[in-house]
């Protein structure tokens, strides 16, 4: 998104992508109204909505064998007309879409199979990166390479961490006739599953107590636990043939103390790793990208970029990041961890989250966003 906005504004930009494509399993896929507004700002909302997606207007859960609805998300008729709703869209499709639109601009270059290995320095100033494909020099390097950012690791920037009581085991199960037509959570004492509707399959997030993700044991025993939690999965679990059909995510909630150094700016998960709770990660990353473009385009155009501009991006985006992370940590410690440890009855969890003032936070965070960004950069073409 950041590269698209720069190229759209007439700024030359090179994107280095580690892989040959964006087809990574179990990436973020929840697109909030704040991101939908941004797509509308740049005139791409109608084309974006032609991608496969599912609308989300409420939260459903199975706490006792029955599927129940809890917590409506903002989805009035007017909001539908203005595309202000939440949807689930596969991130590889989203990234391919943005890359395709960016490639319309001559200022945009995407180099695939180019893994960044180090920074190029002149004194303390970052002047480019070295990759497996080539060395690239730039007025500013934007690190948007995720929670395991190689650029961040090479930068020497310091991280401040928040504790997380959980890890996630991701896997997919094919949908069967009669399955629910909505995403939902399965809540049992000692177990939490998020069943994400992905069209012809379920993307399943199995939340685990921290540090237990690698203690896999018997796959058959694991499948039996899933069926015990939700008997309707009896046929679905046959789609798991080996542990290689699963992917372990070490959940971290952390952020850089300083997002920049001369010539370098970190955004998205490279600046602040988020918990998967709430599906906010991709939306905060897009907001970072838009804010960075709004602040950096003019100094890049005039050759007046300074540390002040990089610091301004952090100043703009740090507060919403801290607020969302604090809420994620609160939910992890006071709702998710007690269910996983067996201390909280799962049937009580939705009512805990629904208590005032917690019940007002999801609609505000999802519907309006915390310090929402709008595109102010021009299209010079």
Where are these regions (language model features)?
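Active-site-adjacent segment of FAD-dependent monooxygenases/related oxidoreductases
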Residues: 32-101
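Generic enzyme active-site microenvironment
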Residues: 15-16, 143, 267
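Short FAD-binding loop at a beta-strand-to-alpha-helix junction that anchors the flavin cofactor
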Residues: 258-276
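Conserved FAD-binding catalytic core of PHBH/FMO-like flavoproteins
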Residues: 124-251, 255-256, 260
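C-terminal helical "tail/cap" subdomain of flavin- and related membrane-associated enzymes
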Residues: 294-381
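A conserved FAD-binding loop/helix module that cradles the flavin
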Residues: 276-288
């Amino acid at each position: 998104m950041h590269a698209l906005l720069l190229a759209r504004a007439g700024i030359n930009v090179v994107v280095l992508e580690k892989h040959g494509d964006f087809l990574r399993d179990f990436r973020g896929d929840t697109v909030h109204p704040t991101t939908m507004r941004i797509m509308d700002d740049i005139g791409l909302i109608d084309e974006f909505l032609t991608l496969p997606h599912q609308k989300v207007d409420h939260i459903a859960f199975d706490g006792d064998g029955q599927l129940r609805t809890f917590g409506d998300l903002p989805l009035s008729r007017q909001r539908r007309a203005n595309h202000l709703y939440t949807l689930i869209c596969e991130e590889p499709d989203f990234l391919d879409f943005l890359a395709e639109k960016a490639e319309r601009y001559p200022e945009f270059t995407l180099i695939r199979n180019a893994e960044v290995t180090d920074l190029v320095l002149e004194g303390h100033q970052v002047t480019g990166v070295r990759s497996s494909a080539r060395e690239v020099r730039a007025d500013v390097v934007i690190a948007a390479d995720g929670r395991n950012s190689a650029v961040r690791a090479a930068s020497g920037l310091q991280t401040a961490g928040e504790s997380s009581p959980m890890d996630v085991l991701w896997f997919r199960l094919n949908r069967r006739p009669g399955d629910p037509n909505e995403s939902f959570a399965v809540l049992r004492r000692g177990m939490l599953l998020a069943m994400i509707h992905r069209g012809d399959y379920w993307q399943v997030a199995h939340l685990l107590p921290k540090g237990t993700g690698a203690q896999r044991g018997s796959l058959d025993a694991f499948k039996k636990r899933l069926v015990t939690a939700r008997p309707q999965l009896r046929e679905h679990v046959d789609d798991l043939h080996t542990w290689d059909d699963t992917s372990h995510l070490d959940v971290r909630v952390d952020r850089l103390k300083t997002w920049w150094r001369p010539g370098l700016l970190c955004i998205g998960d490279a600046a602040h790793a988020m918990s998967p709770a709430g599906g906010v990660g991709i939306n905060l990353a897009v907001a970072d990208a838009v804010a960075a473009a709004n602040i950096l385009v003019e100094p890049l155009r005039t050759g007046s970029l300074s540390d002040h501009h990089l610091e301004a991006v952090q100043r703009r985006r740090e507060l919403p990041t801290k607020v969302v992370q604090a809420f994620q940590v609160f939910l992890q410690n006071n709702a998710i961890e007690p269910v996983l440890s067996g201390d909280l009855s799962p049937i009580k969890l939705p009512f805990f989250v629904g208590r005032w003032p917690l019940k007002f936070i999801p609609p505000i965070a999802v519907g309006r966003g915390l310090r929402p960004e709008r595109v102010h950069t021009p299209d010079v073409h």
